[in-house]
């Protein structure tokens, strides 16, 4: 199926849509900006990049275009620790540039937000551990 046909089917009706105050946002995996549009859709596009936090680590995943007919096999994931943030940023920048150049800025922005959220979660946990 073409991505335009899939988008025309799911754009107004899917389980990930969130509407509030006239805005329609999307919470689907692979949607880097959470906008309900074809450019950022993780369901309709053939090429998607997803950056998420799982168990205190950064997980970067992308779709394998050749395996699109097999959804269970169509994701490639790479896990990074929070220690080396520049290495992770370089990986995401290279992946996005080669794979989906129009998503490079969005992928790096999502990576920055995920890494800062993980850092603040660690600091909050460390403060709670102190007792007098």
Swiss-Prot record:
Q: Recite the UniProt keywords alphabetically.
A: Ribonucleoprotein, Ribosomal protein
What is a single molecular function from GO for this protein? structural constituent of ribosome
InterPro entries, per the entry: Ribosomal_eL28 (IPR002672), Ribosomal_eL28/Mak16 (IPR029004)
Which Gene Ontology cellular component annotation is one that this UniProt entry carries?
Answer: cytosolic large ribosomal subunit
Q: Does the keyword Repeat apply?
A: no
Family to which this protein belongs: Belongs to the eukaryotic ribosomal protein eL28 family.
The record's section on PANTHER family has: 60S RIBOSOMAL PROTEIN L28 (PTHR10544)
* Name assigned to this protein: Large ribosomal subunit protein eL28
Gene name in the database record: rpl28
